């Protein structure tokens, strides 16, 4: 069944289900070992030239696109990224504009923006927050 899913999936997203599985395992068993495993899976996808989906907010007066953000309960702001379109659609909000970005480039860009804590991957379901220290 997953083979059919990959046929209709962007090439850069193929393999991201490994990240989703690692996050699910981390949610079941929140240990340092599982966190290290999950971060290793994400790094491996980065080395494989994997991609994430970013939502973009419409331009305001300055005509600049802004990467979609999520504000967590503690008031911190995170860039929202998704492993696949299914995860992005789980937000239930309005349909957003999206684009694909290389995982590596996303992490490098996040380090340049002081207004965010890092990247929240799949904020609606299989979630992991990757803070600047782990980027």
Residue ranges of model-derived segments:
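An interfacial alpha-helical scaffold signature
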Residues: 1-132
């Amino acid at each position: 069944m997953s083979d059919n899913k990959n046929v209709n999936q962007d090439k850069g997203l193929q393999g991201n289900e490994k990240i989703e599985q690692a996050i699910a395992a981390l949610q079941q068993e929140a240990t340092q070992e599982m966190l290290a495993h999950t971060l290793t899976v994400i790094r491996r996808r980065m080395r494989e030239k994997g991609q994430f989906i970013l939502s973009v907010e419409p331009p305001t007066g300055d005509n600049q696109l802004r990467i979609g953000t999520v504000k967590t309960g503690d008031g911190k702001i995170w860039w929202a990224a998704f492993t696949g379109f299914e995860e992005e659609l789980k937000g239930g909000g309005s349909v957003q504009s999206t684009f694909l970005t290389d995982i590596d480039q996303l992490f490098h860009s996040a380090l340049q923006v002081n207004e965010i804590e890092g990247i929240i991957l799949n904020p609606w379901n299989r979630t992991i927050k990757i803070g600047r220290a782990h980027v």
